[in-house]
Amino acid sequence: MVAQAVSAHARWSRAAQKTRTLDETLLPGARATLETTRGDFTVGRADLASLFEAEVALLQLERARIQSAVDTHLARVDLRAALGTDAPGGSP
């Protein structure tokens, strides 16, 4: 039971950190890149392929963010089950 709790806590911590990294760094960067590329496309400095690539990159990161949030919640459920109680605190 202790090993399950340790494993679940480690998964919870990793998933929560990944979510924070996506929220604080990767998604804002991808949004900024898309806006810059969109502006460049509007004035003819970027081609349609570049705009499409920026949009796809943002969508992939948004999908990764959703999956990371799911992974965080599932790991927390596993931790609660291993401990037989509510996990301490709201975040790892």
Residue ranges and their predicted role:
Residues M1-A64, D71-A82:
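Amphipathic alpha-helical coiled-coil segments
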Residues R80-P92:
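Terminal intrinsically disordered/low-complexity segments used for targeting and assembly
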